[in-house]
Amino acid sequence: MFVAMNRFRIAVGHEEAFENIWKGRESSLAEMPGFRTFHLLRGDTNAEEGYTLFASHTVWASKDDFTAWTQSENFRQAHKNAGDNRGIYLGPPKFEGFTAVVGA
């Protein structure tokens, strides 16, 4: 199992707009071999630094399945508007990938 996460720092006051971007986007993840699940997670707000933390969280059967997604036309289509709404982001997302070593 492989877990892929992108962490986003979203400017305070723009959380709902960010969530709506994700709610309104077309996704073809379910069509991809090895895809298991997706969640958009909302974390705490850091008032001092002016952001709320979010993470996109996908689970894949394997890292190879995730890599195939990132190289697919479906991925390109899903991310074609990624540069829009720049004012709500405090920097680019930070990717983190994990391979399961223990699980139930």
Regions found by a protein language model. Give the residues of each.
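Active-site-flanking beta-strand signature of metal-NTP-handling nucleotidyl enzymes
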Residues: 3-8
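Short hydrophobic/aromatic beta-strand micro-patches
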Residues: 9, 41, 57-59
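Flexible, low-complexity linkers/stalks enriched in Thr/Pro that connect modular domains
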Residues: 41, 96-103
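Short, surface-exposed ligand-recognition loops at beta-strand->loop->(often short) alpha-helix junctions
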Residues: 10-19
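Residue-level preference for beta-strand/loop junctions
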Residues: 2, 50-52
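Acidic pyrophosphate-coordinating catalytic loop
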Residues: 44-50, 103
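Feature marks short, surface-exposed loop/turn motifs that line or immediately flank catalytic pockets
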Residues: 12, 44, 63-64
